[in-house]
Structure formats: C-alpha cells, structure tokens
Regions:
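Extracellular jelly-roll beta-sandwich "head" domains, especially the C-terminal globular C1q domain
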Residues: 1-151
Length: 151
C-alpha cells in the first residue's frame, strides 16, 4: 500500500493534476512517486510467473471548491491513466457560492499488464459552462491518494 497527500490549499487549473507531496511509499517498489509531482507510477510486476497482470485499487479523497475569484458552478476531478481521465471515476459537485468546499471521493480498479507501467494522477476535469469561457480552475485541499495492490 502507498499513500500520497497534500494538505494545504492548492489552485489546480483545468486539465492539470493535483500535486502530492507527502509520501508513504510502497516498500516493494510496485508504486513510484516523486515528491511535488502529481504523477504516480503503477508497475506491472507479478509475483506469480503464471500471472498476466497486477491489479491496484486507487482511491482519491479531497475537498474541492471554486476559488474566490471564480464563478460558482459545476466542478469536477477524476483519476487519469496515462493522461486520460477515467470518466467512471469522475467526482462532480455544483457549488452555489465560491470558496465553499465539498468532499469528493473516487475509486477505480486499475489492471496493469505484466511488464508494463501506467501513470496515474488526479486531474481537474471541470468543463466550461459556455464555449466562450475558459474551464474553471479549482481549489483542492486535504488531497489524499491511496494505492493498494489487490492482485
């Protein structure tokens, strides 16, 4: 098991990753992370030579809000695999005022083929309300990503 956290408030632009800086690393080297990065690498190391994959349960929990200089509206985060948001992991909230924090949780099982590596992250997937306005940035506080090897 590995755990990555970042407790202070951080501003995350649309399409960018949540930064993680405190690490409780995996002692076997299955999960890798560089501090002050939002990227975590899952390795497809197998203990049984007959196995074709390694499976991980990845869970993100954190508080998200629209920043004070933003406009209240729908915001979201999702787990991303190799830069692509996993839509089934998207956590969506709709604050009616700015700087109002909502707790969100997202979990996914990720299967890594033997000998491969996947890069995972937590991404701001908030979309623009109209085609002419940019997608909103979000504040993230108490970010916590837990990776557990399950098979």
């Amino acid at each position: 098991m590995a755990e990555f956290t970042y407790n202070p408030v951080q501003l995350v632009l649309a399409g960018q990753n949540v930064i993680l800086n405190t690490t409780i690393s995996c002692p076997k080297g299955y999960v890798l992370h560089r501090n002050e990065s939002g990227l975590v690498i899952l390795r497809g190391i197998v203990n049984n030579p007959q196995s074709c994959f390694a499976r991980y349960q990845v869970t993100f929990n954190g508080n998200i809000a629209v920043p004070e200089d933003g406009t209240a509206g729908e915001i979201s985060v999702a787990l991303a695999i190799d830069g692509e948001p996993l839509q089934t992991s998207k956590a969506i909230v709709t604050p009616t005022v700015v700087d109002a924090y909502f707790n969100v949780t997202s979990t996914a099982f990720i299967t890594v083929p033997k000998g491969c590596c996947f890069t995972i992250a937590v991404e701001n997937t908030s979309a623009s309300a109209t085609p002419t306005t940019p997608a909103p940035a979000i504040n993230v506080q108490n970010a916590n990503l837990v990776v557990e090897r399950v098979a």
